[in-house]
Structure formats: C-alpha cells, structure tokens
Amino acid sequence: MASKEEILAGLAEIVNEETGLDTAEVQPEKSFTDDLDIDSISMMTIVVNAEDKFGVKIPDEEVKNLKTVQDAVDFIDGAQA
C-alpha cells in the first residue's frame, strides 16, 4: 500500500507524462482544472493511469469530486484500504 507521499509523487509523474507539467507543480492544494489546466479528457487519462499504478478503481461519478490533487490523493489512499 502506497503512503500519501508516494501517491502524491506517483500522481505528479502521471500528470507530467500526460501534460508535460513539471512534477514540482503538482502540489496538494492545486486544482486540476484551474491551476494545472487539465481538461476532462486529460483527467480521464490521468485517472486510468492512477488506477493502474495504485491498483484502485475510481468510479466515473467520483472523478468530478476530485477537484484538487489532495482530493485525488485522499481518494486513492482510502480506496487502497
């Protein structure tokens, strides 16, 4: 099971691969849409890659609730349990 720090680092790598953003830009308080400029198509790719990386399922209806990087970290952390 990945720690919250490992989840954050993994998400930063996934966002970097999808968008080219520097991993240092992917901070817990950042909004995926407002701060990181991630559109819905890129977000779905990030979700699929996160599911694969962390062995969790993020239901489509939950994706809209993942507003910030911390929201995603917390969801993945809870889904691992």
Swiss-Prot record:
Belongs to the acyl carrier protein (ACP) family. It is found in: Cytoplasm. 4'-phosphopantetheine is transferred from CoA to a specific serine of apo-ACP by AcpS. This modification is essential for activity because fatty acids are bound in thioester linkage to the sulfhydryl of the prosthetic group. Carrier of the growing fatty acid chain in fatty acid biosynthesis. NCBIfam families: PRK00982.1-1, PRK00982.1-2, PRK00982.1-4. It comes from the Bacteria. Keywords: Cytoplasm, Fatty acid biosynthesis, Fatty acid metabolism, Lipid biosynthesis, Lipid metabolism, Phosphopantetheine, Phosphoprotein. The keyword Aminoacyl-tRNA synthetase does not apply. GO terms for molecular function: acyl binding; acyl carrier activity. Pathway: Lipid metabolism; fatty acid biosynthesis. HAMAP family: Acyl_carrier. The keyword Transit peptide does not apply. This is Acyl carrier protein. It comes from Micrococcus luteus (strain ATCC 4698 / DSM 20030 / JCM 1464 / CCM 169 / CCUG 5858 / IAM 1056 / NBRC 3333 / NCIMB 9278 / NCTC 2665 / VKM Ac-2230) (Micrococcus lysodeikticus). GO terms for biological process: lipid A biosynthetic process. One of its GO terms (cellular component) is membrane. The modification O-(pantetheine 4'-phosphoryl)serine is found at S40. Residues 2-80 form the Carrier domain.
